[in-house]
């Protein structure tokens, strides 16, 4: 019963979180967005100490249920491992005990903590579990999902139905796509062969929670008086943490999947209070008190350091002709969405899960290929602009990189300023009248003034009122000049309230 309950809850969480990344309408986030906000690393970066405390207490009481139920990357590994067992039934009992690779676990955590505190997010986000799953879902699963949607839309259109509508199918930048494919391939290979190897060797969140789970009140426990040492529980343990020979369980690696309990035919393994007479399981390799103290210090450094860092920073047209996209302008200062407060706050808090990219209905947010903010979202106005009436990205960010803003608040936030390059303007290059930027500016920050001040009848060119401009990018997106637009938006380091 415990195993079935765990599988049901894991299936619910995995399905809902995956749908958050696949949903291009933005309708599911109002109901399911909280599932993204309870992921551990985003909660730490968002300074959601209540959620962090709840997850820590839950781990101390129940063990690593976060890894077996809530973490989508962990459940993905379980699905891959399950398929292997179903396809090759002789390998259903393929697991065996292996000593903990402590040096690798602590090396990865030791690499993770300082890089997180120093703001080297690219290195951190390559191994962060929620970030990794987000990239896999956005760059691998989502394009397949959208292709299926477009096929249904094509069929529906033939029968005069509008139940579906077509949407753009795109993948991230080449570095992001490569990182997603490599991560998925590596995780697939490890899970296919060894179950939860990634969680217990590479994943820093697994190592942190493993420290707490060593002292969990409830856990699978072996009754040595009943145990016949048949080895079935060990062969079903995807965490490779059960040593049948010695009757020991390494609780720092146990993900509380309940497979051992379900497999044992003698009732020798039960989920019980570890400190009752029933429980005779030793702590295996993780029993040394010195290791426990070092582990708590390392975990505490991550939580306290990240929280302090976050606290300090918080003070501070349709047509029939082919349309050629404009070349990306070289901005001196990148753009960050409204609600991110500043460029630094955005880059330091973003976990690159790319949930905002999936949610953006205007195709403004795309993964960055720049080294300093690799795989984090960046704003680009070649396919759309940041509409003042849209605040979806601020509502779905689980890490506090983009904080919630209302529609009214967004209209008063200046994220950038439009800059005019008259050398590219079609008024000068082609000698035609335009004014497209001024007509579509939602803030009325652009006016058309005579090219020749002494001749009121001369062609007019755009002039930007920097105090009114909010940096939405409508002017840049709709400018007809090619290959470079005659107007583009430069970001500002710290957002201003108008």
Where are the regions that the model predicts?
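Non-ligating segments of multi-cofactor redox enzymes
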Residues: 1-247, 252-253, 259-498
């Amino acid at each position: 019963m415990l195993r079935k309950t765990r599988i049901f809850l894991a299936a619910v969480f995995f399905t809902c979180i995956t749908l958050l990344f696949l949903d291009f309408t933005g309708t599911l986030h109002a109901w399911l967005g909280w599932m993204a906000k309870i992921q551990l690393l985003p909660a730490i970066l968002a300074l959601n100490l209540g959620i962090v405390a709840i997850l820590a207490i839950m781990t101390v009481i129940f063990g690593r249920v976060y890894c077996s139920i809530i973490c989508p990357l962990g459940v993905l590994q379980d699905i891959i491992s399950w398929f292997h067992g179903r396809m090759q039934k002789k390998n259903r009992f393929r697991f065996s005990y292996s000593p903990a690779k402590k040096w690798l676990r602590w090396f990865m955590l030791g690499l993770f903590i300082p890089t997180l505190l120093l703001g080297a997010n690219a290195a951190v986000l390559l191994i962060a579990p929620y970030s990794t799953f987000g990239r896999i879902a956005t760059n691998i699963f989502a394009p397949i999902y959208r292709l299926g949607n477009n096929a249904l839309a094509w069929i529906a259109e033939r029968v005069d139905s509008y139940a579906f509508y077509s949407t753009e199918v795109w993948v991230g930048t080449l570095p992001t796509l490569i990182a997603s494919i490599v991560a998925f391939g590596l995780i697939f290979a490890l899970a296919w062969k060894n179950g939860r190897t990634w969680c217990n060797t590479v994943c820093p969140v697994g190592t942190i929670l493993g420290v707490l789970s060593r002292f969990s009140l409830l856990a699978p426990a072996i009754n040595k008086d009943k145990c016949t040492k048949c080895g079935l529980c060990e062969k079903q343990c995807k965490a490779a943490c059960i040593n049948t020979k010695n009757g020991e369980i390494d609780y720092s690696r146990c993900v509380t999947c309940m497979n051992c309990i379900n497999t044992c035919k003698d009732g020798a393994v039960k989920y019980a209070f570890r400190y009752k007479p029933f429980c005779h399981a030793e702590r295996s390799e993780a029993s040394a008190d010195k290791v426990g103290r070092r582990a708590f210090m390392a975990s505490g450094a991550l939580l306290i350091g990240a929280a302090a860092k976050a606290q300090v920073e918080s003070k501070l047209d349709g047509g029939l002709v082919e349309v050629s996209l404009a070349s990306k302008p070289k901005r001196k200062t990148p753009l960050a969405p409204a609600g991110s407060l500043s460029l630094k706050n955005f880059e330091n808090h973003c976990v690159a899960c790319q949930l905002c990219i999936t949610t953006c209905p205007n195709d403004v947010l795309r993964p960055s290929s720049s080294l300093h903010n690799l795989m984090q979202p960046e704003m680009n106005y070649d396919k759309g602009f940041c509409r003042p009436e849209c605040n979806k990205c601020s509502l779905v960010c689980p890490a506090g990189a983009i904080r919630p803003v209302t529609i009214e608040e967004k209209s008063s936030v200046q994220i950038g300023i439009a800059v005019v390059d008259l050398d590219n303007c079609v008024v000068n290059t082609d000698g035609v009248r335009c004014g497209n930027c001024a007509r579509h500016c939602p803030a009325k920050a652009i006016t058309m003034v005579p090219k020749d001040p002494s001749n009121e009848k001369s062609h007019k060119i755009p002039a930007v009122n920097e105090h009114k401009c909010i940096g939405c990018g409508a002017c840049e997106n709709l400018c007809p000049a090619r290959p470079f637009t005659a107007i583009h938006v430069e970001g500002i380091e710290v957002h201003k309230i108008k």
